[in-house]
Amino acid sequence: MLSERRLEVLRAIVQDYVGTEEPVGSKALTERHRLGVSPATVRNDMAALEDEGYIAQPHTSAGPIPTDKGYRLFVDRLADVKPMTAPERRAIHHFLDQAVDLDDVVARTVRLLAHVTRQVAVVQYPSLTRSTVRHVELLSMAPARLMLVLITDTGRVEQRMIDCPAPFGESSVADLRARLNSQVAGRRFADVPQLVQDLPESFESEDRPTVSTVLSTLLETLVEETEERLMIGGTANLTRFGHDFPLTIRPVLEALEEQVVLLKLLGEAKDSAMTVRIGHENAHEGLSSTSVVSVGYGSGREAVAKLGVVGPTRMDYPGTMGAVRAVARYVGQILAES
């Protein structure tokens, strides 16, 4: 186990390397930080940190830089999440509050995350499989034609036109609408099939075919919309960190083009706690020189999707973690209010 002093030396190395982009020497550390020991003592601590794999020298004549293991320890034990300032929080809320629908919320969130973190932002659309029904609207468009409108707790709206097997009167439409909402409003989508399976039997025989058609359309909508979607933005930010990648940023860019890879990354994030994957902790080889900071977001206690950022391992972890957490919280509030 590392002593407190060596932990402080590691903290200083990470902070200086992230801030200056240059390997850090013992003399510079003692000048910039109140370590309370001589450069010679710091050199001994550096040697011990290197022996244990927390830092490494890129060149024999250069100072040390943090390894993935060093960044891991920094994030787990030494990094305090940096809260956003009051003006920053107000700006975030104002920007997101202008969104007109769910697509706009996701698009604004991607732009916002990429801007405030200066990393690549990835935002997953809320999953219908983890959502709940807010309301089901049923409208008569013609004697034998209906419109089904499904509204989720995240503000997602799905519309379907239904051709009925027989005319369906306004009173029957109102009755079905009321019964549907009494059964499914506030319930998880995964529970809907079982909740409505006996509903046709409660209607008159002449209305049962139409009720069954409406229910089939509702359930088909759930199946159609379960495909996971995400949005990515700020890829150009990677060009600022070209020297942080061993050979080229091409493998990173190629990995970011694969939606399956990104969905898996976000899938590893915990619903409420921050998840930080550093370097080779990322299973995809193309992302082995990056760090991924992600967290779940939602309109209630349970997350309905994930968001996060991808950047080099030489990352401002306290600031990035604070920004990701703040944006996720505000997106959840916007969805709850929508």
From Swiss-Prot:
Keywords: Repressor, Stress response, Transcription, Transcription regulation. Coiled coil: none annotated. Gene3D superfamilies: 3.30.450.40, Heat-inducible transcription repressor hrca homolog, domain 3 (3.30.390.60), Winged helix-like DNA-binding domain superfamily/Winged helix DNA-binding domain (1.10.10.10). One of its GO terms (molecular function) is DNA binding. The keyword Transcription regulation applies. Belongs to the HrcA family. This is Heat-inducible transcription repressor HrcA. It comes from Streptomyces albus G. The gene is hrcA.
